[in-house]
Amino acid sequence: MDADKIVFKVNNQVVSLKPEIIVDQYEYKYPAIKDLKKPCITLGKAPDLNKAYKSVLSGMNAAKLDPDDVCSYLAAAMQFFEGTCPEDWTSYGILIARKGDRITPNSLVEIKRTDVDGNWALTGGMELTRDPTVSEHASLVGLLLSLYRLSKISGQNTGNYKTNIADRIEQIFETAPFVKIVEHHTLMTTHKMCANWSTIPNFRFLAGTYDMFFSRIEHLYSAIRVGTVVTAYEDCSGLVSFTGFIKQINLTAREAILYFFHKNFEEEIRRMFEPGQETAVPHSYFIHFRSLGLSGKSPYSSNAVGHVFNLIHFVGCYMGQVRSLNATVIAACAPHEMSVLGGYLGEEFFGKGTFERRFFRDEKELQEYEAAELTKTDVALADDGTVNSDDEDYFSGETRSPEAVYTRIMMNGGRLKRSHIRRYVSVSSNHQARPNSFAEFLNKTYSNDS
């Protein structure tokens, strides 16, 4: 008997077949660099920076920016942002810089140039006759890179959220050490004309390069990061959520995974912790792998590890976390089952902690405490099974365990308890639910059961 086949009749004829469905066609690519070559892009001929500044500023004022010219200018302007490397900087075996080296964002990557000239048109007319200062260059670079952040803000953020962000960014780039070079609201007007620029590979690459540089190098113009910070751990929401989750429940990654009682976690956990990826290395290329073009399909996104993502945010919802209530449910990754497990884990970690004395008046008190704890452990080991369960908890110190949670789930037939449902409904009904959010899912799924 083939376990994958089903048998049925059609017009009295027995049919045996294997049901096959559409599978995920994406091939996840890991970002590890194996050829010891820095990330690389190719741009047009390097421009005269003064001419390029005037052209790009003119285009910004007219809300008509040429993406090729903008990228060429941003790459050339890297020379203005020289800083000192604080430590030897290596990633994936590549030596980026030695301690004390003077470096610019260009030191992190390779930018190849062709002989093709840019347009460098004066779309908005000629306003600046003198050559720009370094602070004016820095302001223009900051405003241009902020277009990346604005284009990453999703439509789910309602009201004037994006406009308010643009206003705050403009304020940064019109105060020292920057200088005002555009009129108010120019940034938002320009953004509307290039709202999808985060999808342009070269622009995204340059945003990631600037962010990687300013995240490590102390610099007068480090505030430029306000527009590029979204490139850090981009398309890593699954891994980022897991990291936040283990900090929230105060467990190690290994301890937390022991609570993941579902077969669909197996492939995702293997995918998320593929060896050799520098996930835990500070200032690695890994942090900006998406923008630097090291992976076309991230294995760390919410879609790539959807069951893990769903579980984490159902636990977050149980604990009343706004971030989890607002997050988008991965509908194809068993949200109903994940909500059940999330309820039990939420109950396990909500309003409960493991505590012990760690600070003492003097060394004598510390030694007395340690001796008392040792005695308590010896008593627990010699336990003959006659103490009641409350004392057993006290002596063993075992207030949390995957085995206990798993047993409770099995005893309840894999269903949520009424107390879980009441908690879910309580946190979700008091929240302004966004479309397809966890709050909306919980409200629609469990509100009638409460």
UniProtKB/Swiss-Prot annotation:
InterPro entries: Rhabdo_ncapsid (IPR000448), Rhabdovirus_ncapsid_C (IPR023331), Rhabdovirus_ncapsid_N (IPR023330), Rhabdovirus_nucleoprotein-like (IPR035961)
GO cellular component: helical viral capsid; host cell cytoplasm; ribonucleoprotein complex; viral nucleocapsid
Residues where Phosphoserine is found: S389
Effect of substituting T377S: In strain: CVS-1991 and CVS-2006
Result for mutant: N157S: In strain: CVS-2006
Post-translational modification, as annotated: Phosphorylated by host CK2. Unphosphorylated protein N seems to have a better affinity for leader viral promoter encapsidation. Phosphorylation of protein N in ribonucleocapsid may stabilize the interaction with protein P, thereby playing an important role in viral transcription/replication.
Coiled-coil features, chain-numbered ranges: none
SUPFAM superfamilies in UniProt: Rhabdovirus nucleoprotein-like (SSF140809)
Membrane listed as a keyword: no
Keyword annotations from UniProtKB, A to Z: Capsid protein, Helical capsid protein, Host cytoplasm, Phosphoprotein, Ribonucleoprotein, RNA-binding, Superantigen, Viral nucleoprotein, Virion
Keyword Iron in record: no
Principal location class: virion
Subcellular location: Virion; Host cytoplasm
GO MF annotations in UniProt: RNA binding
Domain of life: Viruses
Family, similarity comment: Belongs to the lyssavirus nucleocapsid protein family.
Note: Displays a superantigen activity in human and mouse, activating mostly V-beta-8 subtypes of T-cell receptor.
Assembly behavior: Homomultimerizes to form the nucleocapsid. Binds to viral genomic RNA. In nucleocapsid, binds protein P and thereby positions the polymerase on the template. Protein P acts as a chaperone on free protein N to prevent it from aggregation before encapsidating genomic RNA.
Biological role: Encapsidates the genome in a ratio of one protein N per nine ribonucleotides, protecting it from nucleases. If expressed without protein P it binds non-specifically RNA and therefore can bind it's own mRNA. Interaction with protein P abolishes any non-specific RNA binding, and prevents phosphorylation. The soluble N-P complex encapsidates specifically the genomic RNA, with protein N protecting the genome like a pearl necklace. The encapsidated genomic RNA is termed the nucleocapsid (NC) and serves as template for viral transcription and replication.
Name of the protein in its database record: Nucleoprotein
Species of the source: Rabies virus (strain CVS-11) (RABV)
